[in-house]
Amino acid sequence: MAAFTPQWNDWCPGCGNFGILNAEQQAIVELGVDTKNVVVVSGIGCSGKIPHFFRTPISGVHTLHGRAIAFATGIKLSNPDLVVIVNGGDGDLLGIGAGHFVAAGRRNVDMVVILHDNGVYGLTKGQASPTLKRGEKPKSLPRPNINDAVNPIALAISSGYTFVARGYAYDVKHLKELIKSAIKHKGLALIDVLQPCPTYNDINTKEWYDKRIYKLDTLPDWDPVVKKPEEVNEKIKRAIDKSLEWGDRIPIGIFYQNELVPSYEERIKANSPAYLDYTPAKQLIEKEGKLTTIIDPLLKEREVD
């Protein structure tokens, strides 16, 4: 298959990253996306290895710790024709990268962010990540965690993400469908993927999740899609309320979707009508060693007396 690679994979046996990788690969293939136009971006952590496991011509970009969203934003705005998928751990995206995570929601760039959510920093021996609940003590910690946890779903919705979902790494078929929906969505999409870390997190295990997870689309009255502006507040409230459900039952599926909000690309075009026809990736910036882009007139135009 076009997305798969024979590259040897050194994740721990049973790691949820295998399911996430598999779901991403299947989603890309089933959507029939031109693989030359797919870019997979990651930060640092166990999830950071994901770009290495996609076959060329899919492009992979392994970036700095916490900066995957920033890199991906630049890639997408330079060439809006690309399908850009960000992968990052809960520590990478919600710890050092939290500022970029929130700022991205205000822009609504048309790309997908996949959050690998296992409650620990798996690459550095299992320290508590921003999504580990206060008071929990996985085997990697000498004492219970004293910090409160971030709620990725609520944070994404309140920041402005227009597609917000939660998946489960061991339900690859369901996760694949969420990723396909996120790619097709026009705007910024987050998928918070619950994934067991069999090496360091002995609380949120496969057995623990299997007894609790249920799908939102099995609820008869669940409809996360905003169809008119008057519905926004109601849909947001329901989504955030449902995101707080954690314990005996944990919902997965689409929490919120709103395509009435213009993407960042559309907002740029409103100011620069030629943007989508003449994107930065198509522009010649130098010829025979000399710059062809002269910004002096642009700066002059924006001078303030």
From Swiss-Prot:
Protein's UniProt keywords contain Transmembrane: no
Residues making up the signal peptide according to the UniProt record: none
Impact upon substituting residue 49 to V: Slight decrease of the oxidoreductase activity with pyruvate, 2-oxobutyrate and 2-oxoglutarate
Thermal behaviour (record text): Optimum temperature is 90 degrees Celsius.
Mutagenesis / variant outcome for changing residue 123 to N: Strong decrease of the oxidoreductase activity with pyruvate and 2-oxobutyrate. However, this mutant shows almost the same activity with 2-oxoglutarate as the wild-type
Note on cofactor: Binds 1 [4Fe-4S] cluster per subunit. Binds 1 thiamine pyrophosphate per subunit.
UniProt keyword annotation of Transcription regulation present: no
Binding site for Mg(2+): 90, 118, 120
InterPro entries assigned: 2-oxoacid:Fd_oxidored_beta, 2-oxoacid:Fd_oxidoreductase, OFOB, PFO_beta_C, THDP-binding, TPP_enzyme_TPP-bd
Any Gene Ontology CC annotation: cytoplasm
Cofactors (names): [4Fe-4S] cluster; thiamine diphosphate; Mg(2+)
Summary of subunit composition and partner proteins: Heterodimer composed of an alpha and a beta subunit.
Protein name stated in the entry: 2-oxoacid:ferredoxin oxidoreductase subunit beta
